[in-house]
Amino acid sequence: AVQFASKGHTVFGADVNEETVRLVNAGTEPFPGETDLDTKLADVVSKGLLTATTDTASVVAESEAVVVVVPLFVDAEGTPDFGWMDAATRDIAKGLKPGTLVSYETTLPVGTTRNRFAQMLEDGSGLKVGTDFHLVFSPERVFTGRVFEDLRKYPKLVGGVDEASAKHGVEFYEQVLDFDVRSDLPKANGVWDLGSS
């Protein structure tokens, strides 16, 4: 959220934890230890570019793009518990409007975006994916403590549930991210479209 706001975009952060929301709105990092988060967060909050809330549906209704980064827990047998992800998806669906891009960045089992969340978003919003809203999976490729560095260092991978979704996902991430120049990659560092298979 801070990265997107630092590019001049108005960003809403939604969280179920009221203390996290309070800290963010005060410009105080809720998770100490992230390099440069303290100064970057204070800057974007003071400029009015980042606001946090517990009301996900209301800020989704005001947004052109929704990026989902919610923990997915896995038990000892490797079975994922989708409880938090499902709850977030239902809240997003309540506020979803035509033309919105929804991007899941949480690491998910293959096919989850298309086979689980697309239907939940459609059912909860009355909208149709690919026609009324766009849906992509774009796994976060960052390590705690160096998020801003990793966002610049690694290509942003985007896979859409359809061609139009992939196109919108690529366009979105090109607007909100910066990339380091790297000669060791097979093509220019940036947003890489994985297609829509």
Q: Which ranges hold each PLM region?
A:
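Structural/interface elements that position substrates and couple domains in central-metabolism enzymes
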Residues: 1-197
